[in-house]
């Protein structure tokens, strides 16, 4: 249980581990670190981590800009491609949103790229007002 609570990114895991009096070691995942960096870069903008839509969750969602951000660690190798595409289409249909995906495990990954794309999306939104 300790490993499960320590490695999850579910918001209630920490409080539950405290109630169960389990020592909690923090093992941050790459996804968590990167999404926190992105959230800090846009701290003046409302963003929601693990945003739920139907049976799905979005890693990071900017509701004002209808922008879904997905961190695809290892290109989501454990996910079936068709199911992942259907998930994305469902979310886009429900939220009328744009998807931004990036893979932090790509050797060419640079945190500046998703931050720049989010910034461009926000600027584009404001220019159309």
Positions of the model-derived regions?
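Nucleic-acid endo/exonuclease domains
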Residues: 1-129
């Amino acid at each position: 249980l300790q490993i499960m609570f320590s490695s999850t990114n579910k918001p209630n895991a920490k409080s539950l581990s405290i109630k169960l009096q389990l020592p909690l070691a923090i093992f941050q995942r790459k996804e968590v670190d990167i999404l926190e960096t992105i959230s800090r870069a846009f701290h003046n903008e409302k963003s929601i981590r693990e945003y739920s839509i139907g049976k799905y969750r979005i890693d990071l969602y900017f509701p004002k800009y209808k922008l879904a951000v997905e961190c695809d660690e290892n290109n989501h190798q454990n996910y079936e491609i068709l199911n992942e595409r259907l998930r994305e289409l469902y979310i886009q249909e429900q939220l009328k949103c744009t998807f931004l995906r990036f893979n932090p495990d790509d050797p060419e990954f640079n945190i500046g790229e998703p931050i720049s794309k989010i910034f461009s999306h926000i600027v584009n939104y404001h220019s159309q007002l």
